[in-house]
Amino acid sequence: MDEQLEQIEGVVEDIIYENEDNGYVVFEISGGGVLTVVCGIVGELHAGESVICRGRYENHATYGRQFHAQECETDMPKDLEAVYAFLASRSLPYIGARTADKIIDMFGAEALEVIANDPARLTKIPGISPDKADRIQQEFKRMFGMRELIAYLAQFEISPRKAMEVFKAFGVGAMQAIASNPYLLCGEPLQLDFRHADSIAQYYHMEGDCAQRLEAALLRTLRHNAGNGHTCLPRAQLLATASNFIHQPPEKLARALDHCIETEELAVKMFDAVPYIYLPDLLAAEQDIADRLNLLAKRGKNTARDLDKNIQILELTQGFAYAPLQREAIRKAMTENCLVLTGGPGTGKTTTVNAILQLLENQAERVALCAPTGRAAKRLSELTGRKASTIHRLLEVDYTGGVVSFIHNDKNLLKCDVVILDEMSMVDVKLFQALIAALRYTCRIIMVGDADQLPSVGAGNILSEVIRSGCVPTVCLNEIFRQAKRSLIVENAHHIISGEPLQKGSKTDDFFFLETDGEAAQRLVCDLVTTRLPRSYGFDPIRDIQVLCPTKLGPTGTQALNVELQNLLNPPQKGKPQLQSAARVFRVGDKVMQVRNNYEIVWNRIGGEQGVGAYNGDIGIVESINLRERSMVVRMDDRRLLYPAENLNELEIAYAITVHKSQGSEFPAVILPVAQVPPRLCYRNLFYTGVTRARRLCVVAGRRDVVNSMMSNIRQNLRYSGLCALLQAGQPPEQLSTGGEDS
């Protein structure tokens, strides 16, 4: 227990607010003649219960002094008055104040013992049947079973919030399940820290090389690496990594791995005579993608009548001629069943997509435009003048029972003839698998993206793997058009990819480099955001300017810069509400970002439409804060979302974000600090992605040697994936090509 925590105890008098999903409660307790307001994630509480709370007092301007509980122990009501208060609180089914009187009259202070251990005796009360008595007992056991679990897991430093998730996963049998195999906590859907499971295993004197621990380590290693983008790992690397993680010999882990493969907990696939180990769902995803793309590639070509004539008509209408590669892309889009269209900034991808859209619409084809993120979808809509949605919105998320699925799937197909998917480099294998499953057999796919950008945050490297396979028709646009040549952002983006020296630029250009280092770099970035760029260019420092950092750490990492920028742009003021969640402080007016997908959170669109879902990378502004309920309203574009206390950990301050989190977005002005970049993040694709997020202005601030190092390091993040091999395995050798512009 933290020695700094204060302790109070008493009897629950009233429940002011309660969130049943996560156990956040605001309640009043009486003890020592004092009534205290307590709030925190403490699980389910009811009037009449005795509690011991540990935490700290906080003072709020609106709600006064209240106790924020970090730990809460509850005890079954014992004296007659407390037992009656509990029964009369309608916490149990079929029991209200009148029935509570009858139960107390018959059983007195032993009433709860009767409910827990001998519910048949309740049938002596008029109106309580045997079925009702059983229901009362079940609810009582559920209620106090959760309390018991929270207290049990607290000794292993597992929070009440996590304990409630465990209870949801395993129910009243949670403690027995955990005792038999603590490593269940590390698996789906909980994925608790391995050290918690180790602590419980040691409590039960389980050996460090027991089968449950070895197998859990293998699964955890694969899941962890899936979070780093790998869909699979070579067998030898998996064994070595897991061995280092749990300090057990690879030979023992090899036997556990063989058992996991036998029981189909894991899957193995041979690529170039090397065994690769998969989580089964990721192998299924890559195999489904390969099968569908090969099927589309093998299907007969579509007939597009008078295609060249219609392209010429478009050129006359637009007042310009398409470049040869653009014409090639347009032809392939109209005749092939799947196409990859790739190219850097300024090479005419948008112009090409608009031409394809016009020709498809002239043929009365139903086209679905989509992108992986809300910002990317909004940008696609602005560039094409047509409705575009996120992939999640297109498929319609169904989160019934806490499991993500989609309303549109292989049993309920999308009603479209062509899908155009932008920002393809950001799409992970699970999401793309879901999309292709919902497409009709005859539906065509056009994948648009920049293969030189960072790959998806999730597992997979689809765009690069598809291009590398040579199995899918691909056109790579590489000509920079005249209007784009005027932009140093575009010109330098291509210099980065080709490894040529950057043009430094000046204040009259849309790109310039400022040399700086150390703490001076932090001061420069803050000055650019708060003063220089708003004064010189008229940018709003919060809405228009985005700092993109290669890393979270260091003076010019997101963590340090967000503290500085928040205090400069949105400092604390008397009367301005602010809310602390863990190490973060949120204030009205702060720029915030969603950092993980939430498929349940409700939003209201300005204009009346309602929906659900906030996704990793969505950015918004805090509009209001409710201190009593510890909740916030955040506006994201034209949507307002209510974040209750339990969801605040899904938000981060976002004046500065990582380059990885910026994928799929564009900002009027970007500041890219590169004074200190860790070697593992010092590579060309990351620098390129950061620069190409800027629409009107890009300022690179840092050391020239760091810039040169990033530009010269052509290694991309290594990602283990079998998609290229699976695609090629499904194609006859004569159909394979190099994946270049003529493929």
Residue ranges and their predicted role:
Residues 18-28, 628-633:
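Short aromatic-glycine-enriched beta-strand elements
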Residues 272-418, 467, 471-482, 489-516:
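ASCE P-loop NTPase motor cores of helicases and related translocases
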Residues 4-19, 55, 619-623:
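Structural detector for short beta-strands of small beta-barrel domains
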